Curated annotation (Swiss-Prot):
Pfam families: Pantoate_transf
Name this protein carries in UniProt: 3-methyl-2-oxobutanoate hydroxymethyltransferase
Organismal lineage: Archaea, Methanobacteriati, Methanobacteriota, Stenosarchaea group, Halobacteria
UniProt source species: Halobacterium salinarum (strain ATCC 700922 / JCM 11081 / NRC-1) (Halobacterium halobium)
MF terms in GO: 3-methyl-2-oxobutanoate hydroxymethyltransferase activity; magnesium ion binding
Keywords: Coenzyme A biosynthesis, Cytoplasm, Magnesium, Metal-binding, Transferase
InterPro entries tied to this protein: Pantoate_hydroxy_MeTrfase, Pyrv/PenolPyrv_kinase-like_dom, Pyrv_kinase-like_dom_sf
Annotated compartments: Cytoplasm
Length: 274
C-alpha cells in the first residue's frame, strides 16, 4: 500500500523501485476503478474544470468544487495516495487562508496531501504547510493556472536560463519539504537532469521517460476528451462505447423492446386500479 513516505522514497536513486503511477479522478466510481488497478496516487486535479465541469480553463474551479471531488475520491479509495490540487487563488495571497484551504482537504475531505502549482512564491508556503503536517507535492514547468501570464499552454524550460531556474526551484521546494515534484510539458533532457539532481521523486506529464513516475488526466487515458495534449496517449475509447450504448438505449425505448418483462414487476395481489 503506497504512502506519502513510500512515494518520497521512490526518488532515491539508490533504491530499485518501480516507476510511480498517478492518474486523476474526480468522482467515486472512477476512483474505485483507478485504485483497484493498483495506481499509486490519485490526483484530484483542478483539471476537473475542463474534464467534468465544462469550464474552458482551470481558473474558475473553486475550493468547494475541489473539496467535494476530493471527498468523493477519498471515500472510494482504499490504497492509493489521494492528492488534492489547490485551485487558482486558493493559496499564495494570504498564508492563513492558504493553510486553512489546504488543511481542509486533509481534515474534512480525507486527502493525504495537496499539490501546489509552484514558483518562487510557494517555497515558504510549502515549508509552512509541511511543518503543520500537510504533505505538499510541488508542480513546475507548465502550470496551467498561469495560462494568461504564459500566453498559452507552451513547453517550459526550453532555454538554458529557464531550465536552470526550474532546477533551482526544484531544489528549493525539496529543501522546503515537498515530498514529490510534478514536471509538466518540460523537455525530456531537462526533466532527466532535474530528476538526477534531487532526491524526491519527479512525476512527469509530457516530460519524457526518465522521471521517477508518470501522471495523466483520466479522460485522456480512457478516450473521453474532445482534445488531448500532444504528450498524452489514449489507451481506450470510452466516448465511442458510451455513444454506442446510448444509441442502443434510445433504439430500444423507441422500438418498445425496453423495458421487457424481465425488467418489470407485476403485483399479483393488486386488482385492476381504476
Amino acid at each position: 500500500m503506497p504512502t506519502v513516505n513510500s512515494v518520497r522514497r521512490a526518488g532515491n536513486t539508490d533504491e530499485e523501485t518501480d516507476p510511480v503511477t498517478m492518474l486523476t479522478a474526480y468522482d467515486a466510481p472512477t476512483a474505485s476503478v483507478v485504485d483497484d488497478a493498483g495506481v499509486d496516487m490519485i490526483l484530484v486535479g483542478d483539471s476537473v474544470g475542463n474534464a467534468k465541469l465544462g469550464y474552458d480553463t482551470t481558473l474558475p474551479v473553486s475550493v468547494d468544487e475541489i473539496a467535494s471531488a476530493t471527498g468523493a475520491v477519498a471515500r472510494a479509495t482504499a490504497d492509493a495516495v489521494v492528492v488534492a490540487d489547490m485551485p487558482f487563488l486558493s493559496f499564495g495571497a494570504d498564508e492563513t487562508e492558504s493553510v486553512r484551504n489546504a488543511g481542509r482537504m486533509l481534515k474534512e475531505e480525507d486527502a493525504d496531501a495537496v499539490k501546489l502549482e509552484s514558483g518562487p512564491h510557494t517555497v515558504s508556503l510549502t515549508e509552512t504547510l509541511t511543518s503543520l503536517g500537510i504533505p505538499v507535492m510541488a508542480h513546475l514547468g507548465l502550470t496551467p493556472q498561469h495560462v494568461n501570464q504564459l500566453g498559452g499552454y507552451f513547453r517550459q524550460g526550453t532555454d538554458q536560463d529557464s531550465a536552470e531556474r526550474m532546477l533551482d526551484l526544484a531544489r528549493d521546494h525539496e529543501a522546503a519539504g515537498a515530498f514529490a515534484l510534478v514536471l509538466e510539458h518540460v523537455p525530456a533532457n531537462v526533466a532527466a537532469d532535474i530528476t538526477d539532481a534531487i532526491d524526491i521523486p519527479t512525476i512527469g506529464i509530457g516530460a519524457g521517460p526518465d522521471t521517477d513516475g508518470q501522471v495523466l488526466v483520466i479522460s485522456d487515458v480512457i478516450g473521453m476528451s474532445e482534445r488531448s495534449p500532444p504528450f498524452s496517449k489514449q489507451f481506450g475509447d470510452v466516448n465511442r462505447e458510451m455513444a454506442a450504448a446510448v444509441d442502443d438505449y434510445v433504439d430500444a425505448v423507441e422500438s418498445g423492446s425496453f423495458p421487457a418483462a424481465e425488467h418489470s414487476h407485476v403485483a399479483d395481489d393488486v386488482d385492476d386500479v381504476y
